[in-house]
Amino acid sequence: PIDTPALEYLEILIGKGSEETDRQLYRFQDHGGRDVGMRFDLTIPLARFAAQHIHSLGLPFKRYHIATVWRGENTQRGRYREFMQCDFDTIGSLSVATDIETGLVIHNLLRALGFEEFTIRLNNREVLNGLLEKLDLADSAPAIA
């Protein structure tokens, strides 16, 4: 895992999500008077990190990250201002195998946590076509447009 800072310069965070996300940012000035915000997800800090370090990391670059994120929204059932988020990311691969690998990582994680029955949904036609080909079922399955 690669940990990224909980605080980012506000210019890194603003405009990367929706207007709603921008409104939910916890923002303030640090001791140097710079505008900063608390990360609302783990993807934007990863993108900044990758832009700075990808030349030394190599591609494809894979990582997982479990960390706290913050959102300034009204608390209600299932919605919190501070919560843990888990990301599994791959940068630099256009292969459908990456999506399949992500599903397998989720499967193995849930099994390791003791879950026996669960459903994983992947919304990618290319993944389904790839699985059908791998299982030699592509010719016998109905075409998916």
Task: Describe the residue ranges of each PLM region.
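Extended, charged alpha-beta segments that form solvent-exposed binding/catalytic grooves
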Residues: P1-A145
